[in-house]
């Protein structure tokens, strides 16, 4: 069982803040902590300084009169050898660190002779590009309160209210505020069309909203007995996961939407993800179990509905991510008692690799452009870690959050990642870079599955 709700009150709550406004932090002091007008004594050569102020001037006057090209070259070489080629007597900053020799000189020389072109290493910013306030975000490991739609609009649930932030314009709007007896909001997920959004509630209901008209289309109820903490779309099928351990497939086109119910988890379902093909569903629960469900074999009437039951994790599994470049490859992350990222072949059910990250794994995202995986973590560093796949070498660690990074979402072009944490901030990171083929995401037309939903309540 993993740590769920964090009741520790944040110091940010001492004053009211507007949601999704720029968050300004006090400027951090310089690491060197030097005054611009006071020399740094530890970086100065006092012997040379004394020589330059006394005898150095005399030497220059004498050599100027009898200067020759050969003597001048000798003087420069001698200055370099004796480390006397200074331009300043007073040092106002530390010397830059010498570059590390990664290869012996003979190897590096041979490499320079080869005409083979080497791809330059991508620059990964270590700080967030933008930080927005997210007051009253629920600090609960088992919920899913952030999603970025295909129309480039980010949805975030803050307590009882769902806000929409348009990444193209930077504008913010309120979609809905849930009644006190029904809330707070416990999950949110965009439909593939980027216009319709599902909102899971604490009272076991799920609401469907049209973001273009700010209108509620229908309410799904009766399937779950407790809060709905996870949602996942598969075309016209909305899959919901509840604290009751049930997973329900809802066909939003029909009046009685429940078409399948999966039973396998004994505790809350906190993670749901459909594969890119829409054929397999991965679910993670507070029972430390990952299930792989296949629509072609799963049936509500069968005793064993799942394709695979994966029990190697030792803590709650919320973080799930299907690989975009390799079929049947799933990454899963375990909670504070597990701390591992595991990779699975969902065709055979075999565990391909397991990596100890050292801290609670809250969320996982694959890069759409490179063979890279991003993970978000809790105590002690509350960092985002970028991994190279399949070597799982750390490429970067991004810090800035002061509480566990519970939620992550990826922009439609795959370049930017948004992260939300219990510190009540929403941060944006240019972690995956800008591919040459990246194009601005255009809003998609409303898909056919919702053509009849307006008439169903």
Curated annotation (Swiss-Prot):
SMART domains given in the database record: WD40 (SM00320)
Induction: Expression starts to rise in the S-phase and peaks in the M-phase with a non-negligible basic expression level also in the other cell cycle phases.
Pfam name, any one: WD40_CDC20-Fz
Effect of gene knockout: Delay in plant development due to reduced cell number and male sterility.
PROSITE patterns in the cross-refs: WD_REPEATS_1, WD_REPEATS_2, WD_REPEATS_REGION
GO molecular function: anaphase-promoting complex binding; kinase binding; ubiquitin-protein transferase activator activity
Residue stretches of each WD repeat: 138-175, 180-219, 223-260, 264-303, 312-354, 356-397, 400-439
Domain of life where this protein originates: Eukaryota
Subcellular location(s) of the protein: Nucleus
Keywords: Cell cycle, Cell division, Mitosis, Nucleus, Repeat, Ubl conjugation pathway, WD repeat
Pathway the protein acts in: Protein modification; protein ubiquitination
Family: Belongs to the WD repeat CDC20/Fizzy family.
UniProt subunit comment: The APC/C is composed of at least 11 subunits that stay tightly associated throughout the cell cycle. Interacts with APC10, FZR1, FZR2, FZR3. Binds to GIG1 and PYM. Part of the mitotic checkpoint complex (MCC); interacts with MAD2, BUB3.1, BUBR1 and BUB1. Binds to cyclins CYCA1-2, CYCB2-1 and CYCB2-2. Interacts with PANS1.
Name of this protein: Cell division cycle 20.1, cofactor of APC complex
Organism, as annotated: Arabidopsis thaliana (Mouse-ear cress)
């Amino acid at each position: 069982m993993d740590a769920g709700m964090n009741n520790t009150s944040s110091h940010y709550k001492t004053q009211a803040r507007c949601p999704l406004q720029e968050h300004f932090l006090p400027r951090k002091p310089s690491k060197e902590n030097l005054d611009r007008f006071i020399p740094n004594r530890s970086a100065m050569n006092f012997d040379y300084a004394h020589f330059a102020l006394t005898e150095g001037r005399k030497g220059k006057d004498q050599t100027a009169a009898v200067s020759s090209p050969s003597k001048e070259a000798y003087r420069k070489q001698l200055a370099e050898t004796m480390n006397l080629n200074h331009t300043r007597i007073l040092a106002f900053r530390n010397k830059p660190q010498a570059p590390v020799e990664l290869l012996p000189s003979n190897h590096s020389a041979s490499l320079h002779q080869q005409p083979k072109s080497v791809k330059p290493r991508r620059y990964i910013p270590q700080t967030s590009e933008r930080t927005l306030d997210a007051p009253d975000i629920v600090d609960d490991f088992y919920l899913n309160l952030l999603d970025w739609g295909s129309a480039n609009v980010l949805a975030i649930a803050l307590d009882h209210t769902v806000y929409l932030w348009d990444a193209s314009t930077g504008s913010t709007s309120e979609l809905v505020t849930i009644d006190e007896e029904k809330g707070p909001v416990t999950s949110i997920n965009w439909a593939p069309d980027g216009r319709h959004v599902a909102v899971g509630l604490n009272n076991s209901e799920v609401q469907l909203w049209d973001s273009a008209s700010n209108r509620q289309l229908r309410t799904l109820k009766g399937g779950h007995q407790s809060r709905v903490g996870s949602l996942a779309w598969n075309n016209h099928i909305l899959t919901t996961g509840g604290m009751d351990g049930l997973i329900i497939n809802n066909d939003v086109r029909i009046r009685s939407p429940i078409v399948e119910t999966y039973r396998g988890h004994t505790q809350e379902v906190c993670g749901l993800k459909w594969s890119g093909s829409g054929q397999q569903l991965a679910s993670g629960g507070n029972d430390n179990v990952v299930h792989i469900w296949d629509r072609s074999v799963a049936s509500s009437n069968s005793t064993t509905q799942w394709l695979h039951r994966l029990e190697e994790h030792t803590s709650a599994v919320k973080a799930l991510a299907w690989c975009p470049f390799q079929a049947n490859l799933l990454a899963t992350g375990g909670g504070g008692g597990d701390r591992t990222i595991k990779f699975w072949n969902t065709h055979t059910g075999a565990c391909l690799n397991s990596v100890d990250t050292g801290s609670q794994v809250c969320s996982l995202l694959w890069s759409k452009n490179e063979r890279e995986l991003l993970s978000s973590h809790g105590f002690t560093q509350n960092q985002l870690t970028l991994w190279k796949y399949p070597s799982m070498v750390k490429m970067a660690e991004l810090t800035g959050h002061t509480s566990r990074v519970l939620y992550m979402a990826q922009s439609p072009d795959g370049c930017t990642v948004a992260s939300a944490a219990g510190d009540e901030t929403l941060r944006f990171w240019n972690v995956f870079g800008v591919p040459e083929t990246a194009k601005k995401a255009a809003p998609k037309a409303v898909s056919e599955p919702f053509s009849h939903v307006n008439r169903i309540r």
